Amino acid sequence: MADRILVARIGAPHGVRGEVRLFVFTEDPGAVLDYDPLTDATGKKRFRIAALRAAKDHFVARIEGIADRTAAEALTNLDLFVPREALPPPDDDDTFYHADLIGLDVVDEAGVVIGKVVALQDFGAGDILEYAPTLPATKAKTLMVPFSKDAVPVVDVPGRRVVVAEAFVERRPAEPEEGEDTGGE
């Protein structure tokens, strides 16, 4: 499991005084202020949020030491993390941090491993499970399925696997044998 958990991402600058858009991933967005300091992915660079206010679909934050737009631009798309031990433990087996899914086996309903989880994406219409397929006939580098009970009926973090419903498994038909009639001209 990851020792640092992604809690926010810095977006584009907001104005000319060093404020930034902040996309918060905690269940309670205001809780991001409770985690001090936040760090980059390496854990070496530290950031403190001096002020936070809600905007339309994000937050606007002032980060200590960032006083102008140029400094704010340098932080665009920076992920902010906290140590796992700073967060409350999940309540039960059905509760987990998204980071806990990275690296889990993706299996079909028959239990055949079809890939490994590489990310959980949110493009605005709900979470999407992204995985790197291991099936030899699959040419895509990654595949995506909705992260819903219909598409992913089982999430077994202790068992290190997620199950993808058959309707969402991409399988390419085998290549036709040489000379086999494929119905084409």
Swiss-Prot record:
It comes from the Bacteria. One of its GO terms (cellular component) is ribosome. Disulfide bonds: none annotated. Pfam families: PRC_RimM (PF24986), RimM (PF01782). Keywords: Chaperone, Cytoplasm, Ribosome biogenesis, rRNA processing. Coiled coil: none annotated. The PRC barrel domain binds ribosomal protein uS19. Binds ribosomal protein uS19. PANTHER family: RIBOSOME MATURATION FACTOR RIMM (PTHR33692:SF1). NCBIfam families: 16S_RimM. This is Ribosome maturation factor RimM. It comes from Xanthobacter autotrophicus (strain ATCC BAA-1158 / Py2).
